[in-house]
């Protein structure tokens, strides 16, 4: 039986070695209950040595820590407005839409007008609020579905197992996704659970749109959402480079 300090050191070593660990695996490895493992993970997270996730933990990286939603909202604001306006034009009456909780996708509701019989699903508290305002102002006729889940107060979203379980029950016409960064083949998010939710949105949609301004190019988000081969359209101020081969010019909607 390991003493507490020994367990903490062993957990840290396994996180460093594998990048992520699961509570159930740690319980077997350390020969303790899952509840004991969760308490150990809470201690390590409070000391900023690991970051807890649903069912486990990942490495703590202060360099890649995501800025708050309010701080991100101000960055590249004019470009994000133009991208969101372009995205809003893709939404038609009668469709079932899903929108994730980014600061670019978060601007879509203010540009929605004259759509009817539309269902819009989101994991963003802010987007749900803005959509309800659009309904009250009679700019749109829509049903808004706010997904359940645990809240990330810094990002104004819900996420986790419950969120993902509910997303699996839908079949969407279109998904509008944001990201923390992108390279020549993939897009990434800062939060593992938010990345997973966005991935499901893409997989459950007939058409998917990635909204990303040029500041996201080669930024430092860590968790892969999806490859560009899985995404149908890119909306960006960034001119399509030759080395991004998955989008033809028609599907790269430059603003």
Swiss-Prot record:
Xref: InterPro entries: Carb_Metab_HTH_regulators, DeoR-like_C, DeoR_HTH, NagB/RpiA_transferase-like, Tscrpt_reg_HTH_DeoR_CS, WH_DNA-bd_sf
Cysteines paired by S-S bonds: none
Domain HTH deoR-type: 4-59
DNA-binding region location: 21-40
Alphabetical UniProt keywords: DNA-binding, Transcription, Transcription regulation
GO-annotated molecular function: DNA binding; DNA-binding transcription factor activity
Record has Transcription as a keyword: yes
Source organism, top-level taxon: Bacteria
Name recorded for this polypeptide: Uncharacterized HTH-type transcriptional regulator SE_1102
Lineage: Bacteria, Bacillati, Bacillota, Bacilli, Bacillales
């Amino acid at each position: 039986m390991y003493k507490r300090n020994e367990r903490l050191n062993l957990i840290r070593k396994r996180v460093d070695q594998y990048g992520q660990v699961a509570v159930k695996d740690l319980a077997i490895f350390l020969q303790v209950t899952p509840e004991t493992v969760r308490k150990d993970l809470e201690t390590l997270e409070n000391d900023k040595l690991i970051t807890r996730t649903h069912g486990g933990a990942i490495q703590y990286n202060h360099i890649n820590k995501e800025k708050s939603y309010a701080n991100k909202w101000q960055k590249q604001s004019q470009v994000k407005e133009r991208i969101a306006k372009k995205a809003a034009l893709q939404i038609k009456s009668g469709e079932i839409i899903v929108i994730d909780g980014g600061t670019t996708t978060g601007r879509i509701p203010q540009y929605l007008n004259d759509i009817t019989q539309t269902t819009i699903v989101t994991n963003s508290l802010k987007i749900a609020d803005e959509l309800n305002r659009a309904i009250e102002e009679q700019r749109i006729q829509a049903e808004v579905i706010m997904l359940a889940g645990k809240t990330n107060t810094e990002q104004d979203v819900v996420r986790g197992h419950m969120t993902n379980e509910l997303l699996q029950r839908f079949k969407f016409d279109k998904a509008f996704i944001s990201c923390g960064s992108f390279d020549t083949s993939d897009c990434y998010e800062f939060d593992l659970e938010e990345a997973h939710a966005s991935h499901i949105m893409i997989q459950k949609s007939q058409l998917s749109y990635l909204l990303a301004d040029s500041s996201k190019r080669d930024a430092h988000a860590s968790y892969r959402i999806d490859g560009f081969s899985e995404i149908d359209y890119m909306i960006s101020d960034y001119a399509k480079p030759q080395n991004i081969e998955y989008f033809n010019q028609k599907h790269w909607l430059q603003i």
